[in-house]
Design a protein with these regions (language model features):
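Long, histidine/aromatic-enriched segments associated with O2/redox biology
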Residues: 5-426
Length: 426
């Protein structure tokens, strides 16, 4: 089986030696690595490394890669120092792996033969594949069942809410929530899986995997150099998504400002990650006429142009009518209800992926969209928009939300001696 096929491997925890914060990654890649057969994407070689350190975490405005491994973790200790040490170890390991190196300083093959390796080895010989690792904190990290386990309850951001129940939610508790999250994106699925697997290994005894999701075929472009991808309904998805080349809009809608929440000033330069596992009623959709599909979406299926006319990127004319005087873009179409003009100007940076998880006992495909969005404040952005879509969007008849999570993504690591989350625990 070609290694580029999406792997079905889950995360396996094993006892290992964590990479200390002092084990900073060195420039370069492992011996024998080659990116000659890795396709280009977003104007750069897909085998290249993406800088881990910076003002913001990578994996947000980074050009969206083709593959995803997302995992939510529960912290299984109440020891604050152990949690801090883990975040330091994760920072060091993430810095190494995003450069195409092993998770630990010794590697998978060069350690003591009677000790477990400090890397699992499945990415040895592979290029970095533009791997990014993005880490966030869930509401239950701050308080769980009313208990302030780590002395940070008073630093919980007001925007880090417990998401409300939406119509069409059928959330599985086993696919919902989490104290921590890790988003690993790469152009090679084996590289993404390797990243999450090794962070889980390093965290053995401190964290356990609560749930995880593999994704393929990005459903949004986050750069003007990327083409618009298609979702499993067959339509282009994310035509109007925010782009990295729009810094003013990114500042307004994605990055948390220094004055947004005085009690959570540690989040300045960070963002909020909304994750939703959305199952699609694929077989029902496949029996729906093309005309009805396009009416529900509000765009044509080929080019992705709005039904009001023009090309893919032509602004939607919501006032355009047909010969009968009916709106060309239906009042309950997805593109109308999700448009900023009908949501008080709200915009989000979407970074989702398609998924398939086999089939059920009736032979129906378990597939859909793993929705990811980065927002400055979910209370003012995601929640009102999702309420509107769940209530009025006819496309919701073909969708079922089965998993959910909201995470505070702290700013990046750019000062010497800092680590992901250091602003929270200072």
């Amino acid at each position: 089986m070609p290694r580029r096929w999406l792997l079905g491997a889950g995360v396996v925890g094993a006892v290992g030696v964590g990479a200390g914060i002092g084990a900073a990654a060195l420039a370069g890649s492992e011996p024998g690595r080659s990116d000659e057969d890795v396709p280009e994407d977003g104007g750069a070689r897909a085998g290249d490394a993406v800088a881990f350190r910076g003002e913001h975490q990578a994996g947000i405005v980074t050009p969206a890669q083709d593959r995803l491994h997302f995992a939510a973790f529960d912290v299984v200790t109440d020891d604050r120092d152990q949690l801090i040490e883990l975040l330091q170890q994760w920072t060091a390991a993430a810095a190494r792996m995003t450069e195409g190196r092993s998770a630990g300083s010794v590697g998978a093959m060069d350690g003591a033969p009677d000790a477990p390796p400090d890397d699992t080895g499945e990415s040895f010989g592979l290029p970095p594949s533009q791997l990014t690792i993005t880490i966030g904190f869930g509401p239950t990290l701050f308080t769980r069942d009313g208990v302030d386990r780590f002395g940070i309850a008073d630093r919980r951001p007001a925007a880090l809410i417990d998401l409300p129940h939406f119509p069409a939610d059928r959330l599985d508790p086993a696919r919902t929530g989490g104290d921590l999250c890790v988003q690993a994106c790469a152009h090679d699925p084996q590289v993404a899986v390797h990243a999450v697997r090794n962070l889980a290994r390093i965290g053995f005894g401190v964290v356990s995997v609560r749930w995880s999701q593999l994704g393929f075929g990005r459903t949004s472009s986050t750069s003007t150099e990327q083409t618009t991808a298609r979702n499993l309904f067959g339509f282009k998805d994310g035509t109007a998504n925010l782009k990295a080349e729009q810094p003013e809009l990114i500042d307004d809608h994605v990055w948390v400002g220094a004055e947004d929440d005085p009690a959570a000033a540690w989040m300045a330069g960070g963002s909020y990650l909304v994750a939703r596992r959305i199952s699609m009623h694929i077989e029902t959709w496949d029996r729906t006429s093309l005309r009805e599909q396009e009416t529900l979406i509000g765009r044509d299926k080929g080019e992705g142009a709005p039904l009001s006319g023009g090309g893919e990127f032509t602004p939607v004319d919501f006032d355009a009518t047909d010969a009968k005087g009916d709106p060309k873009v239906a009042l309950n179409s997805h593109v109308r209800l999700a448009h900023p003009d009908h949501n008080d100007g709200v915009r989000m940076l979407r970074r989702g992926y398609n998924f398939t998880d086999g089939s059920d006992g009736l032979g129906r495909l378990d597939a859909g969209l793993f929705f990811i969005a980065f927002v400055r404040d979910p209370r003012n952005q995601y929640v009102p928009m999702q309420n509107t879509l769940a209530r009025d969007d006819l496309l919701s008849e073909y969708l079922l939300h089965t998993g959910s999570g909201l995470f505070a993504v702290p700013p990046g690591v750019h000062e010497p001696g800092t680590w992901l989350g250091s602003t929270l625990f200072d």
